[in-house]
């Protein structure tokens, strides 16, 4: 049973997903399913990025390769998927975090415009 809904904002996540090998896509779908169905999502699947005002990273690992998908909670029951990337350094690149924050701000701008009409 779903405890929350996961949706993608625009096509950033879909483009990222389609570029990945099938095994990585399968792992991403398993993590999305965990986010949708588990009341408490393990931190090895979903981790809050400190200092980002609400941005999370979903963590995918296959062998020695690591990927991240940024997302955030619009409310307790709605998770918005943003962009993804293959992680090649120990720390998450600042440019990727900034892109995620930009997309999150864009989401809220669009949502607020819809609510005004």
PLM-predicted stretches and their roles:
Residues 81-82:
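Conserved catalytic cores of phosphodiester-cleaving nucleases, focusing on short active-site segments
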Residues 1-66, 75-78, 88-117:
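Basic, Lys/Arg-enriched alpha-helical interface segments
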């Amino acid at each position: 049973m779903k405890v929350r809904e996961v949706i993608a904002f625009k096509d950033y996540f879909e483009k990222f997903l389609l570029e990945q090998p099938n095994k990585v896509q399968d792992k991403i779908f398993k993590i999305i399913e965990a986010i949708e169905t588990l009341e408490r999502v393990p931190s090895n699947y979903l981790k809050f990025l400190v200092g980002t005002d609400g941005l999370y990273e979903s963590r995918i690992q296959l062998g020695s390769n690591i990927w991240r998908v940024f997302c955030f909670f619009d409310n307790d029951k709605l998770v918005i998927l943003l962009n993804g990337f293959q992680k090649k350094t120990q720390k998450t690149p600042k440019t990727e975090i900034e892109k995620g924050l930009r997309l999150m701000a864009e989401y809220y701008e669009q949502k607020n415009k819809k609510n005004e009409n």
